[in-house]
Amino acid sequence: MSVFLGYIIFLAAFFGLATGLFLGLKAIKLI
């Protein structure tokens, strides 16, 4: 259960980081 919870947190953090990086690159291209 603890490992499963840690995996979900890791996945959410990784997805959030990837999304932020993608949006940042799109913003740079627009400028």
Swiss-Prot record:
It is a single-pass membrane protein. GO terms for biological process: photosynthesis. Belongs to the PetL family. InterPro entries: Cyt_b6/f_cplx_su6 (IPR007802). Coiled coil: none annotated. The 4 large subunits of the cytochrome b6-f complex are cytochrome b6, subunit IV (17 kDa polypeptide, PetD), cytochrome f and the Rieske protein, while the 4 small subunits are PetG, PetL, PetM and PetN. The complex functions as a dimer. It is found in: Plastid, Chloroplast thylakoid membrane. Component of the cytochrome b6-f complex, which mediates electron transfer between photosystem II (PSII) and photosystem I (PSI), cyclic electron flow around PSI, and state transitions. PetL is important for photoautotrophic growth as well as for electron transfer efficiency and stability of the cytochrome b6-f complex. One of its GO terms (cellular component) is chloroplast thylakoid membrane. GO terms for molecular function: electron transporter, transferring electrons within cytochrome b6/f complex of photosystem II activity. SUPFAM superfamilies: PetL subunit of the cytochrome b6f complex. The chain crosses the membrane at residues 3-23. Keywords: Chloroplast, Electron transport, Membrane, Photosynthesis, Plastid, Thylakoid, Transmembrane, Transmembrane helix, Transport. This is Cytochrome b6-f complex subunit 6. Its main location: plastid.
